[in-house]
């Protein structure tokens, strides 16, 4: 007895895309590629393509859908580019292209490419079909044969192609048409709009097909049940009591009932049914064939209009023998003439054919599982069956009495008939009307006779028997015995063992409903989400439909070990026959493996593996289809015959799944655990080598596929172009980052001022361009001041007369620095050495740049531009300005002045007096040593400053997100070149 889920069938939404493509393709060779991953990797290839190309399915998985791995030296480059453009533009197109098989045999293919869309109208897959057209193309290699040679070559090619097609053709059952044409090519020619979509959808039915579990069909079945009982009651009554439908109302009612049953036959040709595997069959052809083979003939015979045939009989002739319509028909009649008896026989024949209508009870029998799902309905049906049996027995009991009351030999009434006794008891005896109609009249009415007959059969069936109506003749006694026997059986079966019947017949159903109630209570108690609850309920229904409530493990435990192993081999026979890895296994090895296999049933949407879970099982797909999802992209579609998991026999560690494996349809998987498989392989060493060599995983969950999405590539390209076209980032003068730089500069100036208090100021300032040299005892006519700095310099000459008498130095100073020379602090400056003097010079340079700092931001670009035009500039190195100004230390003793070498003003020349060489070398070494130490300290500080700046910029960016990007990242020019060097000099 089937339960509600089995009666309804498996109706959960499924992704039947792969099944639809395979069903439509027949002998077509095709591959499926992911349209959302770079290079469009292959996620599925059918057996036809594998045999045509020579590659195994595992070898072509994840390769490009353009089949670039099959290109060769003779493949046309333009066609390759057209194929790639078709993929990039998501178009439908077809090409003729020369490609190479795995053994490098060149073959001409006719390739058709079609995009597959999902429910969001987004292209997610590419369908590529391949047809071998080598026989219809020019020979690839030079062939000298002509004429009949070409014809022979063409014939040979066509013959081989037909042989391949016959090999690729699936096995068909006996009587099935083998020569099926592929519908996939026709679909591709019509366009991509009618291609199946890759999405979850409920089982679809054609518009003229009715679901057997819909509300309309359920209501119709209950109406048919009521009309069937109506037929089962009236047909025996009309046949037994020989009533003629002279009443037009009854004739119309019976005709309407016949029409309804004819309509039911038509509906049965358009109603789905549940297949042997629990699936809903909605194919019109299969529905028609199934109905014609089962109940069509019986339903047709039960719907013939027998009342209409009887209506055309001679009503007057028949009425002559009927007598009073309120009395019984033939029990009180004189024997009719011969021709009347013949007409009566024909009428009785058609009346007897009404019994065929009782075949309508077959509708109740085949739909009994629809009605017994409800306890009250079962009880009502049982009572109705008992009452219907009593009704039939009453009709037969009256027919016996009607036959026995008239004596054919003496033409008299038998007074030992139960009808005669009934007539005498109720005071309506039979009387012969000799002067009138010449017939027997009187007797009990039909209603009294039927009620009395039903009373007698009921008392006999229940074994009560009051005795007021008793059989008298031999035939009546025999029938009474039969009634008692049948009654005892019915009474004991229906009333005495109702509980036992329910327990035996509906034990699985009760267990099924008990389990469903427990699951519903559990889901309600723990408030499981609605979507997950529906998945759980659908899984339970589908699993029960497949197993019929039978506990396989419990049954196997009952059987002995040898028998259990044989059963397991039979249950896993599909895996052992389809995969070559098991061909060399011995019987003992197969039995050991079969004992370890488990059968798993999965509903649509179930996840077999989650990403990150341990892969501890090897799974073989027996039926259904699954998808492998990595990073929200479908990287593989698995179907019948595929294997996924991990190569346990080659890896020492337990793998983690790199992808999700989700069922698209109802799937049956045969699973073997890692430990169990390794145990068998360790024991059967010879088989282990063959198994590891021949078993090829369609998808290895241990390996992660590295790919780039086309959408990511496009987004990166757009961002790169956007950054390329963006304006330079500029900070406004009052920006917090700008203020932060000024604050760092002020702290540095304060630190330098503190260090300057204890050092000498009279040392050479190489970086600022001021060099102090001692004169020799030779008198000179004049002294020169040469300015070496980033701004344009102007040499200022002092005549000898204007210089003090005790002047021993020639000073190189900046313009306008006459009043900025050493003053009262000269004694402190004399104590300072090396790099301290350079720092002091830096401080003086800051004083010199007061004018530039006072300038507005509007005049800053012009001054910077003028400074950029200077011939002599300060570099980023720590070398002195002397070397940059071409004042070489090895030439200081020459008699010419430094203006001879100065690039500033060549026309103004001044004398340059030599200084002691050892003093300069000592100063330079000291400067070099201090520079190294300061550079290290500055590098450390700049590293920490950069980290702080990065954090500050991140905070400011988040706080000022409401501002425009141009305002946020706008950087203004520094206030002066010196401040810019102070901040960014170390970088």
Curated annotation (Swiss-Prot):
<keyword id="KW-0967">Endosome</keyword>
<feature type="transmembrane region" description="Helical; Name=Segment S3">
    <location>
        <begin position="291"/>
        <end position="309"/>
    </location>
</feature>
<feature type="region of interest" description="Calmodulin-binding">
    <location>
        <begin position="673"/>
        <end position="770"/>
    </location>
</feature>
<feature type="transmembrane region" description="Helical; Name=Segment S2">
    <location>
        <begin position="249"/>
        <end position="269"/>
    </location>
</feature>
<dbReference type="GO" id="GO:0042734">
    <property type="term" value="C:presynaptic membrane"/>
</dbReference>
<dbReference type="GO" id="GO:0031901">
    <property type="term" value="C:early endosome membrane"/>
</dbReference>
<keyword id="KW-1003">Cell membrane</keyword>
<feature type="modified residue" description="Phosphoserine">
    <location>
        <position position="972"/>
    </location>
</feature>
<comment type="function">
    <text>Pore-forming (alpha) subunit of a voltage-gated delayed rectifier potassium channel that mediates outward-rectifying potassium currents which, on depolarization, reaches a steady-state level and do not inactivate. The activation kinetics depend on the prepulse potential and external divalent cation concentration. With negative prepulses, the current activation is delayed and slowed down several fold, whereas more positive prepulses speed up activation. The time course of activation is biphasic with a fast and a slowly activating current component.</text>
</comment>
<feature type="region of interest" description="Disordered">
    <location>
        <begin position="960"/>
        <end position="987"/>
    </location>
</feature>
<keyword id="KW-0597">Phosphoprotein</keyword>
<keyword id="KW-0770">Synapse</keyword>
<dbReference type="InterPro" id="IPR001610">
    <property type="entry name" value="PAC"/>
</dbReference>
<keyword id="KW-0325">Glycoprotein</keyword>
<dbReference type="InterPro" id="IPR003938">
    <property type="entry name" value="K_chnl_volt-dep_EAG/ELK/ERG"/>
</dbReference>
<keyword id="KW-1133">Transmembrane helix</keyword>
<feature type="short sequence motif" description="Selectivity filter">
    <location>
        <begin position="463"/>
        <end position="468"/>
    </location>
</feature>
<feature type="topological domain" description="Cytoplasmic">
    <location>
        <begin position="270"/>
        <end position="290"/>
    </location>
</feature>
<feature type="region of interest" description="Required for phosphatidylinositol bisphosphate binding">
    <location>
        <begin position="151"/>
        <end position="162"/>
    </location>
</feature>
<dbReference type="GO" id="GO:1902936">
    <property type="term" value="F:phosphatidylinositol bisphosphate binding"/>
</dbReference>
<dbReference type="GO" id="GO:0008076">
    <property type="term" value="C:voltage-gated potassium channel complex"/>
</dbReference>
<dbReference type="GO" id="GO:0071277">
    <property type="term" value="P:cellular response to calcium ion"/>
</dbReference>
<dbReference type="GO" id="GO:0030424">
    <property type="term" value="C:axon"/>
</dbReference>
<feature type="region of interest" description="Interaction with cyclic nucleotide-binding pocket">
    <location>
        <begin position="699"/>
        <end position="701"/>
    </location>
</feature>
<dbReference type="InterPro" id="IPR005821">
    <property type="entry name" value="Ion_trans_dom"/>
</dbReference>
<keyword id="KW-0472">Membrane</keyword>
<keyword id="KW-0630">Potassium</keyword>
<comment type="subunit">
    <text>Homomultimer. The potassium channel is composed of a homo- or heterotetrameric complex of pore-forming alpha subunits that can associate with modulating beta subunits. Heteromultimer with KCNH5/EAG2. Interacts with ALG10B. Interacts with RABEP1. Interacts (via C-terminus) with CTTN. Interacts (via C-terminal cytoplasmic region) with Ca(2+)-bound calmodulin.</text>
</comment>
<feature type="domain" description="PAC">
    <location>
        <begin position="93"/>
        <end position="145"/>
    </location>
</feature>
<comment type="similarity">
    <text>Belongs to the potassium channel family. H (Eag) (TC 1.A.1.20) subfamily. Kv10.1/KCNH1 sub-subfamily.</text>
</comment>
<dbReference type="Pfam" id="PF13426">
    <property type="entry name" value="PAS_9"/>
</dbReference>
<keyword id="KW-0631">Potassium channel</keyword>
<feature type="topological domain" description="Extracellular">
    <location>
        <begin position="310"/>
        <end position="345"/>
    </location>
</feature>
<feature type="transmembrane region" description="Helical; Voltage-sensor; Name=Segment S4">
    <location>
        <begin position="346"/>
        <end position="368"/>
    </location>
</feature>
<feature type="modified residue" description="Phosphoserine">
    <location>
        <position position="979"/>
    </location>
</feature>
<dbReference type="InterPro" id="IPR003949">
    <property type="entry name" value="K_chnl_volt-dep_EAG"/>
</dbReference>
<dbReference type="GO" id="GO:0005249">
    <property type="term" value="F:voltage-gated potassium channel activity"/>
</dbReference>
<dbReference type="InterPro" id="IPR000700">
    <property type="entry name" value="PAS-assoc_C"/>
</dbReference>
<feature type="topological domain" description="Extracellular">
    <location>
        <begin position="400"/>
        <end position="448"/>
    </location>
</feature>
<dbReference type="InterPro" id="IPR014710">
    <property type="entry name" value="RmlC-like_jellyroll"/>
</dbReference>
<dbReference type="GO" id="GO:0071805">
    <property type="term" value="P:potassium ion transmembrane transport"/>
</dbReference>
<feature type="transmembrane region" description="Helical; Name=Segment S1">
    <location>
        <begin position="221"/>
        <end position="241"/>
    </location>
</feature>
């Amino acid at each position: 007895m089937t339960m509600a889920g089995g009666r309804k069938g498996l109706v959960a939404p499924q992704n039947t895309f792969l099944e639809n493509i395979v069903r439509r393709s027949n002998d077509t060779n095709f591959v499926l590629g992911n349209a959302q991953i770079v290079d469009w990797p292959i996620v599925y290839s059918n057996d036809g393509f594998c045999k045509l190309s020579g590659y195994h399915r595992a070898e072509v998985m994840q390769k490009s859908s353009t089949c670039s791995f099959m290109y060769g030296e003779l493949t046309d480059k333009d066609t390759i580019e057209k194929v790639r453009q078709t993929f990039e533009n998501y178009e439908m197109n077809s090409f003729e292209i020369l490609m190479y098989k795995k053994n490098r045999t060149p073959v001409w293919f006719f390739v058709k490419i079609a995009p597959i869309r999902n429910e969001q109208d987004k292209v997610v897959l590419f369908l590529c079909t391949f047809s071998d057209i080598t026989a219809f193309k020019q020979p690839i290699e030079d062939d000298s044969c002509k004429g009949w040679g070409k014809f022979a070559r063409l014939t040979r090619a066509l013959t081989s192609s037909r042989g391949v097609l016959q090999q690729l053709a699936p096995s068909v059952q006996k009587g099935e048409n083998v020569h099926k044409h592929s519908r996939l090519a026709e679909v591709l020619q019509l366009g991509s709009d009618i291609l199946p979509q890759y999405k979850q959808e409920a089982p679809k039915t054609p518009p003229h097909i009715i679901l057997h579990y819909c509300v309309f069909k359920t209501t119709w079945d209950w109406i048919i049940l009521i009309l069937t009982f109506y037929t089962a009651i009236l047909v025996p009554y009309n046949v037994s009591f020989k009533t003629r439908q002279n009443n037009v109302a009854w004739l119309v009612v019976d005709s309407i009932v016949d029409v309804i049953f004819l309509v039911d036959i038509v509906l049965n040709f358009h109603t789905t049914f549940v297949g042997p595997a629990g699936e809903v069959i909605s194919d019109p052809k299969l529905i028609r064939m199934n109905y014609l083979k089962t109940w069509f003939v019986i339903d047709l015979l039960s719907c013939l209009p027998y009342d209409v045939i009887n209506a055309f009989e001679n009503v007057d002739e028949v009425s002559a023998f009927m007598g009073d319509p309120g009395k019984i028909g033939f029990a009180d009649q004189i024997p009719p003439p011969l021709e009347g008896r013949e007409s009566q026989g024909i009428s009785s024949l058609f009346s007897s054919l009404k019994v065929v209508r009782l075949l309508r009870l077959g509708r109740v029998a085949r739909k009994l599982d629809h009605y017994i799902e409800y306890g009250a309905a079962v009880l009502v049906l049982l009572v109705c069956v008992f009452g219907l049996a009593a009704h039939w027995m009453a009709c037969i009991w009256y027919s016996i009495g009607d036959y026995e009351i008239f004596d054919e030999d003496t033409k008299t009434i038998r007074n030992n008939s139960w009808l005669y006794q009934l007539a005498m008891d109720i005071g309506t005896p039979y009387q012969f009307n000799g002067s009138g109609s010449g017939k027997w009249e009187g007797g009990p009415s039909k209603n009294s006779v039927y009620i009395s007959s039903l009373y007698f059969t009921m008392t006999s069936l229940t074994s009560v028997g009051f005795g007021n109506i008793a059989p008298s003749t031999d035939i009546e006694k025999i029938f009474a015995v039969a009634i008692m026997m049948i009654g005892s059986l019915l009474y004991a079966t229906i009333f005495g063992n109702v509980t036992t019947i329910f327990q035996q017949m509906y034990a699985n159903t009760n267990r099924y409903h008990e389990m469903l109630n427990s699951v519903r209570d559990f889901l309600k108690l723990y408030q499981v989400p609605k979507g997950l609850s529906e998945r759980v309920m659908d899984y339970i229904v589908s699993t029960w439909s497949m197993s019929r409530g039978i506990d396989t493990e419990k049954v196997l435990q009952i059987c002995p070990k040898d028998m259990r192993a044989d059963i397991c081999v039979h249950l896993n026979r599909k895996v052992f026959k389809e995969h070559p890895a098991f061909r060399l296994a011995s019987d003992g090895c197969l039995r050991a493996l079969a004992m370890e296999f488990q059968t798993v049933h999965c509903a649509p949407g179930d996840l077999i593996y989650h990403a990150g879970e341990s892969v501890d099982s090897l799974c073989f797909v027996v039926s259904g289809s699954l998808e492998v999802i990595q990073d929200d992209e479908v990287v593989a579609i698995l179907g019948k015959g595929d294997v996924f998991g991990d190569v346990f026999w080659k890896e020492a560690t337990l793998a983690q799944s790199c992808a999700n494996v989700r069922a698209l349809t109802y799937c049956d998987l045969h699973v073997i655990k890692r430990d169990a498989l390794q145990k068998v392989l360790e024991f059967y060493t010879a088989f282990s080598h063959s198994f590891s060599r021949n078993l090829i995983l369609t998808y290895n969950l241990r390996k992660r596929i590295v790919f780039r999405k086309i959408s990511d590539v496009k987004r990166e390209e757009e961002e790169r172009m956007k950054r390329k076209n963006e304006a330079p980032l500029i900070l406004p003068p009052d920006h917090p980052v700008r203020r932060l730089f000024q604050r760092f500069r002020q702290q540095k100036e304060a630190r330098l001022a503190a260090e300057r208090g204890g050092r000498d100021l009279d040392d050479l300032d190489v970086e600022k361009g001021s060099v102090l040299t001692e004169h020799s005892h030779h008198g000179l006519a004049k002294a020169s001041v040469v300015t070496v700095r980033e701004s344009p310099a102007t040499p200022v000459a002092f005549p000898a007369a204007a210089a003090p008498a005790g002047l021993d130095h020639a000073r190189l100073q900046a313009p306008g620095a006459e009043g900025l020379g050493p003053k009262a602090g000269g004694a402190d400056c004399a104590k300072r050495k090396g790099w301290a003097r350079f720092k002091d010079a830096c401080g003086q340079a800051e004083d010199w740049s007061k004018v530039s700092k006072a300038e507005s931001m509007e005049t800053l670009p012009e001054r910077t531009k003028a400074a950029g035009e200077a011939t002599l500039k300060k570099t980023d190195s720590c070398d002195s300005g002397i070397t940059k100004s071409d004042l070489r230390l090895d030439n200081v003793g020459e008699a010419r002045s430094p203006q001879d070498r100065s690039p500033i003003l060549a026309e103004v020349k001044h004398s340059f007096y030599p200084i002691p060489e050892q003093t300069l070398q000592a100063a330079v070494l000291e400067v070099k040593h201090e520079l190294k130490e300061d550079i290290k300290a500055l590098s450390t500080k700049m590293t920490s400053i950069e980290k702080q700046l990065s954090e500050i910029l991140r905070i400011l960016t988040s706080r000022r997100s409401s501002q425009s990007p141009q305002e946020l990242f706008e950087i203004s020019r520094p206030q002066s070149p010196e401040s810019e060097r102070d901040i960014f000099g170390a970088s």
